[in-house]
Every structure is written in structure tokens, then in C-alpha cells.
Amino acid sequence: MSQGIEFNRLMLDMRSMQMDAMAQPKSVAPAPELGQSSFADMLGQAINKVSDTQQASSQLANAFEIGKSGVDLTDVMVASQKASVSFQALTQVRNKLVQAYQDIMQMPV
């Protein structure tokens, strides 16, 4: 019986929050500027992250191969798959960028 009371109280609280949210005027605040990073900077950071992931995976695999204690095969495989997926995603981004560049270059002026 107490669960029903708690549920009803929860529903009443949710409805009151909904009414409060609907009653308040909505204003759109401009997004705070966080240093204006360029697309090239963001792409460079993504490439560095992929590189770091691959290096960490390689180091973990080497540690497992030499029999270092505390390194499990599952950890090695998960790290390897993370590196593989991140590299594949980066490759797809590169392919899309190349395709977009080619499309722009083929546009009539």
C-alpha cells in the first residue's frame, strides 16, 4: 500500500514540475563560447585520441604476450576492439570528407 502512496506522490510532483516548466517563459540563451576551436583542431584531437587508443591497445597486448601479471585476455581484446572501432570510424570520417571535397570541386562555378 505504501508503494501506491509513493507512486501517487511521485506523479503529483512530476505534474507540478511539468506545470511549473510550462508556466515559465522560455528564453534561449546563447551558447557560451569555449575557445572557438576550429574544425581542423577538432579533427586533429580526434586523430590524436585514435592514436592514443591504438598505442594503449598495443602496449596492453605486448604486456599480455610477455606474461605480465594483472593483464587479462579480455582486457586485451576489449582494448583491441576499441582501437579497431575508433580507427574504422576515423576512416569513415576521412572518406566522407574526401567525398565532400570532390563534390565541391565538381560543382560548376
UniProtKB/Swiss-Prot annotation:
GO terms for biological process: bacterial-type flagellum-dependent cell motility. GO terms for molecular function: cytoskeletal motor activity; structural molecule activity. One of its GO terms (cellular component) is bacterial-type flagellum basal body. Signal peptide: none annotated. It comes from Pseudomonas fluorescens (strain SBW25). This is Flagellar hook-basal body complex protein FliE. Disulfide bonds: none annotated. The keyword Metal-binding does not apply. It is found in: Bacterial flagellum basal body. InterPro entries: FliE (IPR001624). Belongs to the FliE family. Keywords: Bacterial flagellum. Its main location: other.
